[in-house]
């Protein structure tokens, strides 16, 4: 197996196959569930808006893949600093049956100098998730934070407040996951000594098998080849799947989605 094939198979099994579009429908989510079951294995999860969780749960069960996890988003995509709203959305997502919640960190508040609201918001959502045995990923929106110091600070605050994963991006801003921001975030995980309990998720902009290989190489360099399993690493993507399947000898590499 070539290096690209090997990394593509790894990446496929680490994907949070995503649709977060304004025109999402039950039919599109059902199709996403079907795509998550591939000839070479299943994706780790799908990521969808909360209202689609029940139909996704039903579809995954019916197609014989009940262990594909269902992730959703809250405080999305703007990362506002209203803790009550973020918490209410997170509780609603849990009530819908989410296995994982990806909450947006109040990154604009951090840029303006307010570190406390980010901690408090993540902690409130973590408490709700922990009580329901739901995984919490925190989206820090690296493409808007821009500066290394802010990316580092948002990562640190999120981890201190209980994040199970730190995630680069919503996919809704001009700059999403980059190898540079990925390295900064994973270095925080390393420097804080939390690599056993905290994972990393690049999202948006990871579109090709070669992209995925680059992002995995950074994880392997920092933590060794065995760290990036589905409890410690995810790719938030949709168009990536077709490229991975093509690298693995399935399909033509074309995708219907741009995330």
From Swiss-Prot:
Active-site residues, as the UniProt record annotates them: 102, 167, 201
Gene Ontology MF terms in the entry: deoxyribose-phosphate aldolase activity
UniProt-recorded name of the protein: Deoxyribose-phosphate aldolase
Reactions the enzyme catalyzes: 2-deoxy-D-ribose 5-phosphate = D-glyceraldehyde 3-phosphate + acetaldehyde
One CC-aspect GO term: cytoplasm
Family membership noted in the UniProt record: Belongs to the DeoC/FbaB aldolase family. DeoC type 2 subfamily.
Gene transcribed to yield this protein: deoC
Originating organism: Salmonella typhi
GO biological process terms held by the UniProt record: 2-deoxyribose 1-phosphate catabolic process; carbohydrate catabolic process; deoxyribonucleotide catabolic process
């Amino acid at each position: 197996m070539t290096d690209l094939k090997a990394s593509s198979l790894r990446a496929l099994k680490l994907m949070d196959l995503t649709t977060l579009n304004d025109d999402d429908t039950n039919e599109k989510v059902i199709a996403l569930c079907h795509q998550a079951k591939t000839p070479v294995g299943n994706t780790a999860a799908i990521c969808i808006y909360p209202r689609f969780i029940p139909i996704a749960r039903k579809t995954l069960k019916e197609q014989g893949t009940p262990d594909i996890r269902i992730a959703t988003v809250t405080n999305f995509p703007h990362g506002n600093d209203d803790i009550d709203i973020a918490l209410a959305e997170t509780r609603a997502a849990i009530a819908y049956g989410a296995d994982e919640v990806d909450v947006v960190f109040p990154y604009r508040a951090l840029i303006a100098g307010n570190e406390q609201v980010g901690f408090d918001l993540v902690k409130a959502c973590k408490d709700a998730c922990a009580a329901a045995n739901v995984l919490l990923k925190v989206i820090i929106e690296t493409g808007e934070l821009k500066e290394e110091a802010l990316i580092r600070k948002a990562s640190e605050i999120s981890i201190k407040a209980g994040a199970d994963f730190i995630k680069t991006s919503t996919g809704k801003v001009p700059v999403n996951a980059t190898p540079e921001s990925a390295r900064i975030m994973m270095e925080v995980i390393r420097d804080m000594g939390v690599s056993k309990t905290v994972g990393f998720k690049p999202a948006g902009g990871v579109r090709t098998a070669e992209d995925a290989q680059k992002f995995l190489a950074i994880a392997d360099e920092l933590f060794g080849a065995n760290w990036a399993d589905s409890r410690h690493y995810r790719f938030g993507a949709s168009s990536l799947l077709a490229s991975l399947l093509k690298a693995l000898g399935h399909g033509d590499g074309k995708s219907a989605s741009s995330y």
